[in-house]
Amino acid sequence: MPAHEIIEKAIRKVADFPKPGVLFYDITGILVNPKAFSYCIDCMEKEYSAAEVDAVAAIESRGFIFAAPFAVRRKLPLILLRKKGKLPGETYGINFTLEYGQDVLEVHRSDVTRGQRVLLVDDLIATGGTLNAAAQLLALGGAKVIGIFGVVGLPFLHYQKALAGFAVKTLVDYSGE
């Protein structure tokens, strides 16, 4: 079975989670399948092999899972973007709107440097709102997002609009099925 098919088979689709009418794309099947998990990281490595990247930034919490092994392989710093109040010390913060309310992302001020070229990673790209806020957050410290990577993309939720101007790469796209 081709590796790409292994990824698709590993992603469970859970109806009515976390609330009625929502189809949840569960990536945990990738994590318990070493071949699928390795394939994800291999794809990131191949996609960004020629890219000038100074650091990898990851969205809490499932973005950490995919960004960390890539950062280790490339010997790059890993910048954690966390929810409000989870980071000690001085932070940059940004408020943003979700489909179900407001949220805040923060990053340590000391982790972001002016001119830093950052690859932004999350497990799933839905509306693009969180990733757009993350890019704005990194810009507060002078960093520039050179690409956005997600294992799963949901283009039917129009993330392309929120992330216009960014080079977005996903491994698997779903059309709402």
Each language-model region and where it sits:
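Active-site-facing substrate-recognition patch
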Residues: 1-53
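PRPP-dependent phosphoribosyltransferase catalytic core
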Residues: 3, 9, 133-177
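Residue-level signature of catalytic and energy-coupling elements of molecular machines
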Residues: 21, 56, 148
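Phosphate-coordination loops involved in phosphoryl transfer and adenosine-cofactor binding
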Residues: 53, 114-115, 165
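Short glycine-rich phosphate-binding loop at a beta-alpha junction
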Residues: 53-60
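Short Gly/Thr/Asp-enriched flexible loops that form oxyanion-binding sites at enzyme active sites
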Residues: 65-74
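Short, glycine/charge-rich flexible loops or terminal/linker lids adjacent to PRPP-binding catalytic cores
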Residues: 76-118
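Conserved G/P- and acidic residue-centered "switch" motifs that form tight phosphate/ATP-binding loops
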Residues: 123, 128
